[in-house]
Amino acid sequence: MLSVAKRLDAISEWGSVVALTYIAAQRSFVDYSDMADAKAMLESITRSFGLIYGEARHVRINTISQSPTATTAGEGIEGMEQLRLFADRMSPLGNADADDCADYCVALFSDLTRKVTMQNLYHDGGFSSVGITGSALEQIFS
């Protein structure tokens, strides 16, 4: 899609492209399977086309690694609701919901982030940086 957009000059100079990914692109998550591979490829395309399109038209291309979020696609993943609840408990700020994600996308489309490109930006309430919380340990061993 990005290759066609570049060939057709379909994105304005200094435009922004944002795609959604998930932490399973970098870490193992049970039952995420082929989707993890697809998300890893998406993040790689973000870096590659971020360079190509950035040099050509200053187009910014980023991915957002979102919290486990209740979506139509997510409903097809076995155990997704349990993962969402677990991530919410592990995140110092709690999970970011779909509305929070939409707000973050708007910020990335704005000129306030005009120098942010080729990044995978975590939007997960801190889940991606936490090893384990005290409350999770208590839950595991109680």
Over which residues does each language-model region extend?
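A glycine/serine/threonine-rich, flexible loop-to-helix segment
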Residues: 56, 63-90, 100, 131-142
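Residues immediately C-terminal
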Residues: 128
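Catalytic loop of short-chain dehydrogenase/reductase
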Residues: 9-55, 66-70, 94
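Hydrophobic positions on the long internal alpha-helix
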Residues: 1-8, 45-46, 104, 108
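C-terminal helical subdomain
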Residues: 63, 81-116, 121-125
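Generic structural signal for alpha-helix termini and adjacent loop/cap motifs
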Residues: 7, 110-114, 132
